[in-house]
Structure formats: C-alpha cells, structure tokens
Swiss-Prot record:
It comes from Mus musculus (Mouse). It is found in: Cytoplasm. This is Small proline-rich protein 2I. Its main location: cytoplasm. Belongs to the cornifin (SPRR) family. Residues 40-53 have a biased composition (Pro residues). Residues 40-76 are annotated as: Disordered. Residues 21-47 are annotated as: 3 X 9 AA approximate tandem repeats. GO terms for cellular component: cornified envelope; cytoplasm. Disulfide bonds: none annotated. Keywords: Cytoplasm, Keratinization, Repeat. Sequence repeats lie at residues 21-29, 30-38, 39-47.
Amino acid sequence: MSYQQQQCKQPCQPPPVCPPKKCPEPCPPPQCPEPCPPPKCPEPCPESCPPPSYQQKCPPVQPPPPCQQKCPPKSK
C-alpha cells in the first residue's frame, strides 16, 4: 500500500451519541404557594382638576422701543 493510498483513507467517524435509553423522570409538579391574596383595590381617583381658567389674558407684546441712538456724522 503506497503512502498516497494511506492518506486517502477517510478516518472512521465516531459512532453517533445515542440518547440514554431510560426516559427522564418528569418534573414533579411545582409546589403551589398559598394562593395570592385578592388584589387590593386602588384608592378611588381624586376628582379631576378643574379646567384652567383662561380669564387672565396675556399682556400684549410690547414692540421694542425705537432706537434713539444717533450715528455720529461720517468724517470725510
């Protein structure tokens, strides 16, 4: 058998991993704690706020005062 033929042989595949034959035991049912107490009712909602009163009017926007500064005469 030449060296090349030896190289060409595929190595054996490992046997597949068989699952264990014994069935796993089912989990025991969870131990229920004491039943939950009934949910506490929240306090009743406070009365809603009255709508804001729109009687106060905003002061009118004042335009900026006109510029009082005078430019110095240009010197020639």
